[in-house]
Amino acid sequence: MIAKNIDVKLNVRPIYIGLVHEYAYEGPCRFGEGDALEKEYDQMVSRETYEIFKQDVFSHVPAGINMMDPIYLEATDEWVNSEKIYETLSAEIDKIDLFVFNFQIARGFIYVEFAQRFHKPVAMIPHSCCEETLNTAALHARGHEAYAFYSWADYEGYLRALRTRKALQNTRVLVASRFSSVKSYGGTDNFVNLEEITNRLGVKFRNISVHELLDQLHEVDPYSNPTIPGRKGQNINAEDTALAEKLADEFIANADEVRMDRAAIIDTFKAYVLVQKLMDHYECNAFTAPCPDLCSTRRLSEERVTFCLTHSLNIENGIPSACDLDFNSLLTQAVLENLSGKSVYMGNANVCSLEDGKLPTIFGDFDDAHIDHLDDKTNLYSMFHATPTRKFDGFEQPLKKYSVDSFAYSGFGATVRYDFMQDEGQEITVCRIDPTGTKMLAAKGTIVASAGYDGKSCGPLD
């Protein structure tokens, strides 16, 4: 079973710290009269505030967040920093990703020492009188991870972001490579240093030879693969072939149009099923394979497969997947899918500026006819790849309309062909992580045109 990073949960522990005065008195930090100065009154108010706190935090739980049992604590005006406090706070600490606190004046010393002791991310809920900014500043100055929020909507956004960070930390990429497991021959803007990506983001990379992978496409004795003679491979078997046939028939049945042979589609699904087996075997939940250097082996041509459909199906099932060893795209997918709950489209990007009023030839059949309906032909930008998915509306939503055609003109390599005009006017996010892995471009766009639905190779295009 592949442990998908979209299923990762962020474990959050809510903590409320009340303040109980042991004696009745007034002073510069305490004021009131009558029963309001009694210890029992403080305890009553603290409990009431705790109930409000619980209602607030459990009313703002985004998808993928696991709110753990809350903790109630009482500090006193003895200012004794009791060890029992930290024993209580640290219960199940290895399971917890974020501690969310609520308290008011004169309890921040507990918050700060907790972060110093245990080095876990902490946060304060919005609207905690006076305490959010000063305690966050105190911890930032000491080099600790701490958050404060402008509003509950802001709070929920940070929870989603922190869950996405955890999803990245739980991403393990199966890298099929020929010459190099770090260098892409079709994408020089790839990550410069994968070790740095692992150190900073926690993403792990597991390697397999493309030849070892392709050998296992054959339904033969798994000990007979020429690349690993005598060692058991994960070769597809009769059960896997039956599954590939079943998946292919479902793929055909759900399509508006199919323009290639069923047998060739089944071959493509065998590659998909094999990649699932290998990800499961190596305990990975993401996949990438090279393009130009794999293509030039002629093995894809001999095996009559491409990995385009494997990438499409992986992505629409919440498994980051990229051609051309495009690690940047892979991790961008992980970020976007975890934040949005929708599948994404991986594509090559191009500026479409008109020259002498006409669209320059960029790729395939994308020409002026595809943008004639536009009144405004400025600021156009195109993306294309043979890896659209059928789940752009969400992982749990019905399939979008699509057709099926081969990548190769000789009829092999099934691909999803998608008409983006069915999403005309849809606002989208265009996103890319830079080669250093330290910056991300995120921009808004609107779908206004489409091409390549009836074509082959690396389309469709939007």
Regions found by a protein language model. Give the residues of each.
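Glycine- and acidic-residue-enriched helix-capping/strand-helix junction motifs
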Residues: 21-51, 181-192
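Short N-terminal or domain-adjacent regulatory/targeting segments
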Residues: 1-32, 145-164
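Anaerobic metallocofactor- and corrinoid-dependent redox/one-carbon enzyme cores
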Residues: 3-16, 29, 37-79, 102-104, ...
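Conserved, well-structured core segments that form the ligand-binding/active-site neighborhood
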Residues: 131-342
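Short hydrophobic segments within beta-strands
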Residues: 15-17, 125, 174-176
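Generic detector of short, locally flexible boundary/turn motifs and exposed helical patches
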Residues: 32-36, 62-66, 86-92, 111-115, ...
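Well-ordered mid-protein domain cores that form the structural environment of catalytic cofactors
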Residues: 78-159
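Surface-exposed beta-strand edges and their flanking turn/coil or helix-capping segments
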Residues: 25-28, 137, 161, 220-223, ...
